[in-house]
Amino acid sequence: MVFTSGPATVGPGMIVDSDLGNAIRTHRDLISGHATYYKKSSEFYKQLSQRLCDASIVLDLFACSLDQVGAAEIKAPVESSGGFMMLGESFESDQFRKCLRHIFNHDEDGNLKMCFDATIEIVTTKDVKICGALGPCVSLRKKNSSVSEKEIGEGGTNMWKLGILTNKTCIAFFYQVGDEQKVQAGSAFFIQFITHYRLGNMGIRKRVTTAARRWVGNHSPEIAAGFDQEAAASVMARLAIHEAERRYARDVIRWLDNMLIRFASKFGDYVQEDPSSFRLSSNFSLYPQFMYYLRRSQFIDVFNSSPDETAFFRLLLNREGVVGSLIMIQPTLFQYSFDGPPIPVLLDVCSISPDVILLFDSYFYVVIHYGSKISQWRKLGYDKDPNHESFRKLLEAPELDAEQLVAERVPVPKLIKCDQHGSQARFLLAKLNPSVTQNSMYTDGAEFIFTDDVSLQVFMDHLQALAVQG
């Protein structure tokens, strides 16, 4: 475990020198090549990753500081070993205490709620080739005939090492259909996962899971019927941040757009050269908007984040399950009003209203947004008046739900309370679909966003136009 309040200033893992006149690196420095120590220190920590893997050691990083500490460089050994990362402001905070207690949670037998020194081996039928894995694992570079020449993430192997294994560990494996011979539709193929792990003092355990599937024809309706758009979005997000580690953000966005156009062209129903005829079935309809919010997310657009924050965001996304990943990609938004119980609303600027409260969950932070009328009534103390009991209950409801969200999640998300038009409202506005901007025809009093970003509707119109081209 590493507990730090600042970056390394000496040694091979040096992040910044001790001269206070030199600022720590930013994303602009990384892009322009002006981050003096970044490449050297990153290489040092990558070499450390292999040593940790060989010794089956897990590295946890607890960083509490108002500035960066070098998490971007240290990310490699933390991620590959399956370690925990926390970025906070103070070691005296409840956030730090909760994260530390979480690490040492144990069962009724006194064993930690995690397994160590794990390996996952994959065995496939001859028509399926293994490309690699993305997640908290390391390739053991053990090749056989089922390993593809194409590598994705930790590839070139059919066996991976995991320093730690919990009930929330999530790894994405990638496969390629072999083209040596044409497979026959209706015939079966198998993928087997063989997992070894050490469970407390109870020795080594072995678990074998075998999945069987049938081959179908290229244009079979079963392909569409079996498509899981939520899981697909989660996997594409991991692929996108994997690409973002090696390419410029604009190139990653272009890659995502090209993949989405191919997807829409293949699975959409349309008359060629007629965008108005374009339709996607219910199994595919949400996928384009997932990609819209992914390309706008902090995982790809790093403009408002430090390198340490970006490393933290990407590390968590790369190990989170489908549900958590979707919240990171497309946050949830609930509306509280006098009209009834809370309801989910569109992640759109039009959802902001003076007489409602919004509860926004982006996984990393939770925002309670008070409309201007609600805020004014609260400042006048109406919630303390027995004659306005319904208003008091309205104020309490989102706070109770927000506390539950914060209590269930580790690392602990930041809780932000803000008023409409207040400075803290930017945390919500930055994630909303800008359907109304400063360039729109809007009515007086309507909420709008100052931005040059395209709205979801404009994005979909362009997608439809490109998908139906010959």
Language-model features, listed with the residues they occupy:
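Extended acidic, low-complexity intrinsically disordered regions
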Residues: M1-G470
